[in-house]
Amino acid sequence: YNPLRRPELVTERRNVVFQQMYRNDMITKDERDSLSLLPLNIDYSPESHREGLATYFRAYLQEFMNKWLRDNPKPDGSRYNLYSDGLRIYTTIDSRLQSLAEESMNEHLKNLQSEFFSQNKESEENPTPPFKDLREGQVDTLIKLSAMRSERWRKMKLNGKNEDEIWATFQVDTPMKVFSWSGEIDTIMKPIDSIRYYKFHLRASMMSMEPQTGHVKVWVGGYNYKHFQYDQVKQGRRQIGSTFKPFLYATAIDQLKLSPCYTVPDALYCIEPMKHGNMNAWCPKNSSDRYGQTRNLKNALANSINTISARLMDQVGPKPVVTLMKKMGINSYLPEVPSIALGTPDISLYEMVGAYSTFVNKGIYIEPIFITRIEDKNGVPLFEVIPETTDVLSEEAAYVTVNLMEGVTKYGSGGRLRHSGLEETNYIYKNLITGYPYAFENAIAGKTGTTQNQSDGWFMGMVPNLVTGVWVGGEDRAVHFDDIAFGQGATMALPIWGQFMKKAYLNPELGISKEDFPVPEIVSIPLDCENLNIESSEKKKDLEELGF
């Protein structure tokens, strides 16, 4: 008795009820007759993707399904109706984890945005907020380009308005509702001013995946689909900063059998001109601009030491690193030049989570899966997903890379995940590290990432059965914090991961692992750096031959 598919049957059934009411003296004959003549007047529209849980995922799912419906007609050749044909679509999203992820993102972004507003007031030193290092003319151009991509502009263009007419409407005070973290605001504002207002707002995305199955458990493309419809999980591509480095280290481990314990001098290092596709010499500096220590590879990755990344890139070359990343599902453009070691390529969060899952899944890449099957109304399967896998790394090389990344959360840039609260007097810890202290004691591998000028903050966090990536940044690269203490991945993105995992561990039914990462049966590469004297071993000679 679906009123959308069988209105005549439903009308007949309704009139039977009216007849029974008349027979039982509940209504008069005239009332029965008049009610029976009324149409159903079904007030129905499909649920909006603008509100509720997993709005960005539902919008992406609808896009996927629309394409699937075009390519997969009914047996009679007609097209399935997504809303009225009773299709059963089974997705991999865990609503409980999804809810925790959205809560965690909202809690942290609210704190972070408040700080960003306070640091971006217009002044003589900051004449074009929220844009850093842009002149007024450049800002005007950027704003106009954004206006031309807006829904308002598109609709007026379709209605035959010319550019001057459309642009004039952007200068007129207009009633509108705008987003704020304290709730939607009814206001009057010029559309051109609303664009700049929204540019002030930092954006974010988050995705979680079960590495052994490829099942996507969390998909958060942003924090308010009504006002920010661009999905930063799959559509957005941003520079990934130091989250690139595990791919470089994994290539070196796989090709050269390097141990996390190998010691390397932290000194300025140059790749000479005309080598590895370079036209000029490439001599990256450390973000701290400090040098002089001797570090093992585990410490170097934990602290994102650029000079040691340059040494590794010189030894393996960019091409093998790019080849590895493409096998791990990264289809974004990757130039084969040494500077990619610092994370200059633009890559989506979707690609990054899939790629990082390879490390936890014994070196096997599984393409992320968000639908397992589609059935018709009778339960007949119409579509079932067969996971696509690729052998990328040996199980040993994958495990050693995970072991390296465990150092990031033990004594590196992700170490605040281990803190128990001793830093509470610090302004940033007290006000911006949402959910702090986390005091995690279980095995966690991860990597922070921060791009040039703090335009992007990343954190990739892994436990044995869940890989999660978080990105935070402005819509435009010119929108960023000035101070790296505020704009680094450990401040912008890591707290979302920490808060999310903290909440997830409170519910044992979710089954999120607190165990150690499984160790392969054979591990020939030394991992116990405290009890291994590399300097007195034959490995020192091997390293010298490799240029270390």
Report the location of each language-model feature:
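Extracytoplasmic/secreted proteins, especially bacterial periplasmic and envelope-associated proteins
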Residues: L9-Q20, S34, G52, Y56, ...
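A generic secondary-structure signal for well-formed alpha-helical elements
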Residues: V17-T28, M65, L69, H108-F116, ...
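Conserved catalytic neighborhood of penicillin-recognizing serine enzymes
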Residues: S45-F57, L258-K319, Y365, E375-E406
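Mid-domain, small-residue-enriched loop/turn segments at the edges of structured enzyme/sensor domains
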Residues: N278-K285, V316-G354, G363
